[in-house]
Amino acid sequence: YIGDERFLPAGHKDRNDQTINEIWLDNSPIPKKNIHFIKAELGLLEARVEYENTLKKNDKFDVVLLSMGEDGHIASLFPGHKYPENRSVIIEKKSPKIPRQRLSMSYKQLNKSTYVFKIILGQPKRQAISLIFQGYDLPINRVCGEVEKIFIHSSAIPVGGEQ
């Protein structure tokens, strides 16, 4: 299951499904029937309903793997944005990143997991890491499942007095 998708035409080079297929799944033994992408090309509302129905077939994830954006966002859940708490898939219409419209699993859905692994890489993430250590409420902090493991590459760890 994919956590989010950009609202772009099928096959567009900037869609998450394209990148995931090229880098990983095209060369993977995972059966295609076990791979579930968000069909953004259906339109925002239709794609949300379709993916919510897909997610209903699997009540809980064994593992959720998350990476974090420079601002502390995960999937397409951004700092300072309010999302419906009763949905498993949300529509983001004002993403601070292009494209503005996206579909994403909700916090509620991502938390339906036994294990949540968070991977944080790169110097541009240092400010967000600093905010996390200071207790700021960032999207990355809102998903933890039953067991949470955080992997922070040394390049992302603030050094000296960095804030």
Language model region names:
Residues Y1-D4, A10, K60, I74-L77, ...:
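Active-site histidine-anchored catalytic micro-motif
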Residues Y1-L65:
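Ligand-binding beta-strand-loop-alpha-helix segment within the catalytic cores
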Residues P29, K56-N58, L66, E70, ...:
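Solvent-exposed alpha-helices and their adjacent loops that cap or buttress functional pockets
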Residues K32, F61, R87, S113-T114, ...:
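Short, well-ordered alpha-helix to beta-strand connector turns
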Residues R48-V49, A75-G80, A128-I132:
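A short secondary-structure junction signal
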Residues V64-K108:
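Class I SAM-dependent methyltransferase SAM-binding "motif I" and its flanking Rossmann-like core
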Residues N111-Q163:
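C-terminal functional extensions of proteins
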